[in-house]
């Protein structure tokens, strides 16, 4: 009798432990898998699966999966200016925002005022590495 009760109790515990909040988990996974641009204090990361990650550094350098891409002075200046604009928007978002964080709590949606863009519209023509990342650039997030 004790063995039957013990096995029944273990089966109930396993069933309860396996039943998590699937909706919350699904929302979390969907948010994480979206293409996005994360603006941190030292770097802007552009992520879009299955493409490699792009990192923009404060001095305007561009890295693709940790490999630095050679840029001319005009391209580097454009990325440096965009980095500064994104840092200003990040600070404004972090100090003023009451927006909900994403599912992990790491990032907030970046508030870009109407009529302003951190990157020029011809970014993909001027720097070909950005051609496949327009969806990610349209989803800016501020890292906490």
Q: Which residues fall in each region the model found?
A:
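Sec-dependent bacterial lipoprotein signal peptides
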Residues: 1-19
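Terminal leader/tail segments of proteins
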Residues: 19-144
């Amino acid at each position: 009798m004790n063995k039957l009760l013990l096995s029944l109790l273990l089966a109930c515990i396993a069933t309860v432990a396996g039943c998590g909040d699937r909706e919350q988990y699904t929302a979390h996974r969907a948010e994480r898998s979206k293409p996005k641009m994360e603006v941190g204090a030292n770097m802007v990361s552009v992520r879009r699966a299955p493409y490699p990650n792009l990192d923009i550094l404060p001095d305007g350098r561009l890295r693709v999966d940790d490999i630095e891409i050679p840029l001319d002075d005009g391209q580097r200046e454009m990325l440096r200016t965009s980095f500064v604009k994104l840092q200003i928007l990040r600070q404004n978002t972090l100090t003023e925002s009451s927006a909900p964080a994403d599912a992990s709590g790491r990032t907030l949606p970046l508030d870009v005022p109407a009529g302003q863009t951190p990157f020029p519209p011809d970014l993909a023509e001027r720097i070909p590495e950005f051609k496949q990342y327009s969806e990610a650039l349209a989803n800016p997030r501020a890292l906490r």
